[in-house]
Amino acid sequence: MVSSNGSQCPYDDSFKYTLYGCMFSMVFVLGLISNCVAIYIFICALKVRNETTTYMINLAMSDLLFVFTLPFRIFYFATRNWPFGDLLCKISVMLFYTNMYGSILFLTCISVDRFLAIVYPFKSKTLRTKRNAKIVCIAVWFTVMGGSAPAVFFQSTHSQGNNTSEACFENFPAATWKTYLSRIVIFIEIVGFFIPLILNVTCSSMVLRTLNKPVTLSRSKMNKTKVLKMIFVHLVIFCFCFVPYNINLILYSLMRTQTFVNCSVVAAVRTMYPITLCIAVSNCCFDPIVYYFTSDTIQNSIKMKNWSVRRSDSRFSEVQGTENFIQHNLQTLKNKIFDNESAI
């Protein structure tokens, strides 16, 4: 499908339908399984929950809500027709932005919580409570839903292909970008990306500096290694999933408002947009890795389950070995009796 950005740069972006269909199918399977397992562990397996667990539960719920909309998107990208109505189109768009920026903010909450626990372990006791964590989570949900509301307002289904099919998730008109969306993108990028990015990098740097102080050298190397792994995994997932898309979104907004009209740059930005969006969506699959490295209780639960499985397997092997030993002795005894009878 050849489209235009409102300037003299026609561009064929039809490759995005195949890319979205394949990537969203994979994210649906992996994201559904991993986040369902995570929520089961959080709710059913963990006996003790703290404020970090509260953030992770909300992050998993945000991922699942978006994952549940993926089958509708997959159908649309496969058939290029949206038969599910305007309301479901708006809900799907809202949950996309809610998930992306909700994930960014909840990951930032986890990073700040870790910073307070390690850098100010005693002073932060009154702040790091489950009640305060719940209040923060409610504030995050209101923020991301409020931020995604304008996109929902402007997004709607429309006829395409001589009125033979309905379209959803397609781009907004150039006039809408110039009047409203460019300002909304600026707000979203500042509140939902740049401030959280600065907080994540700053908190991680402060934690690393605290761990390297002579006062903390007495701490076990194992605990320091755990924290270092935690910070590394957290930052890698955050930067890998969200930095490319949000940087490209800024360039895309500039392109749609015709701030620059160089056709080579326009083609590069439009090509990278669906690719970076797919990378951002993959955060649903990577968030459970954050849960594992962040929570000792989750690691212990998984290790306990593996230990119980191995223990049951070893018990089964012992029982089976004992039965084989008894059967072997009985067979030997029978053979001896038979030999004695034959000798008589």
From Swiss-Prot:
Residues 1-25, 78-90, 156-183, 252-272 are extracellular. It comes from the Eukaryota. One of its GO terms (biological process) is blastocyst hatching. It is a multi-pass membrane protein. Residues 47-56, 112-134, 205-230, 294-344 are cytoplasmic. The keyword Secreted does not apply. It is found in: Cell membrane. Keywords: Cell membrane, Disulfide bond, G-protein coupled receptor, Glycoprotein, Lipoprotein, Membrane, Palmitate, Receptor, Transducer, Transmembrane, Transmembrane helix. One of its GO terms (cellular component) is intracellular membrane-bounded organelle. Pfam families: 7tm_1. Ubiquitously expressed. Detected in the hair follicles and skin (at protein level). The keyword Lipoprotein applies. Its main location: membrane. A lipid is attached at residue 284 (S-palmitoyl cysteine). Binds to oleoyl-L-alpha-lysophosphatidic acid (LPA). Intracellular cAMP is involved in the receptor activation. Important for the maintenance of hair growth and texture. This is Lysophosphatidic acid receptor 6. It comes from Mus musculus (Mouse). The lineage of its organism: Eukaryota, Metazoa, Chordata, Craniata, Vertebrata.
